[in-house]
Design a protein with these regions (language model features):
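Structural helix-boundary/capping segments
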Residues: 66-70, 74-77, 85, 119, ...
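Glycine-rich, N-terminal phosphate-binding loop of Rossmann-like dinucleotide-binding domains
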Residues: 93
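Short low-complexity, flexible loop/linker segments enriched in glycine and/or proline
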Residues: 12-22, 106-107, 153-155
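Short helix-loop capping/hinge segments that flank enzyme active sites or metal/cofactor-binding pockets
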Residues: 19-80, 96, 101-103, 141-149
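Short, basic, helix/turn surface patches
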Residues: 23-40, 118-124, 160-170
Length: 170
């Protein structure tokens, strides 16, 4: 049966990105952080590119982080409602089969999806769908792609159902 939670998955990904990028930036050296903050202050307010959104999240205030965290909790409640009717949700693991590791700087990395170069952060879309809401997910390998790299399916369960998702994958 086709089933979808009651929220826009792209919106969920945006919230995931805000929270993830702000958390990751906490480890940024002070000088780099100050330089990035100055750069962000000079961004065009209408610039909603992935790079601009990432940079804004990296220098967000605690107030902005807390607002995004509140949105996360609203998403969590929508997941709670979803799992009142479904035991688990099956999703892809990534938008592509596994790919070779890219050692370039994170911002320079890209993914090929249907012969189109895409933003590397899109690769964590499916992981973020469960991760932003603290939901357990287990990856079940399902085979190998044409290049010999693995393909899998993600099993997402309700909060605290780790053993359910692991059991289904087992």
């Amino acid at each position: 049966e086709a089933a979808r939670p009651g929220f826009d998955p792209d919106y969920s990904h945006e919230i995931y990105g805000r929270l993830l990028h702000s958390t990751m930036a906490a480890r940024m050296p002070d000088g780099d952080y100050e330089s990035l903050k100055k750069h962000v202050d000079e961004l065009d307010p209408d610039d909603q590119s992935e790079v601009a959104r990432t940079q804004r999240a990296q220098v967000s205030s605690f107030k902005e982080w807390a607002a995004a965290n509140e949105l996360r909790h609203r998403i969590r409640w929508q997941w709670h409602d979803f799992f009142e009717n479904y035991d688990v949700l099956l999703t892809p693991t990534t938008p592509t089969p596994a790919f070779k590791h890219d050692h370039r700087k994170f911002g320079d990395r890209t993914l090929m999806v249907d012969n189109e170069e895409r933003n590397y952060f899109e690769g964590v879309f499916w992981a973020g769908l469960s991760g932003v809401a603290y939901l357990p997910s287990t990856i079940l390998p399902t085979g190998l792609g044409v290049d010999g790299l693995p393909i899998g399916v993600q099993i997402i369960g309700p909060e605290y159902s780790d053993l359910v998702t692991i059991g289904l994958a087992g």
